[in-house]
């Protein structure tokens, strides 16, 4: 496994790894990089949905969206994802049900349930098909906060996001 820091200074690029056979130590390193650098990019993987769940579970608990034996027809669930993977965007509408976040236009902004105190700290995105030309952008709020001047930090220090 080779690790390179992107020119932005906070994205790790990992090459020379097959996630299906990655050791627990390698997965722990990937998890540590995600916590440290916010975004980890690993390209050229050929994972089936069950492989994705296995890889993610080496990092930590995966959200159980629906019971593992739930039929995927007519849902946003991905076949073989054991009730833990949802389709994002369009494409194959299982029983007329589109994936989450299917939009004709760009989604300007969203985040991982910021109003939920116990939200899962990691989001896994895996482009399977029809992702050519799409773009996902990330912001590092830790660096954004660190870049604020001390006066503004003092003004906002007691702000809380209501649930």
Identify the role of each PLM range.
Residues 2-163:
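Non-heme Fe(II) oxygenase catalytic core, chiefly the N-lobe of the double-stranded beta-helix
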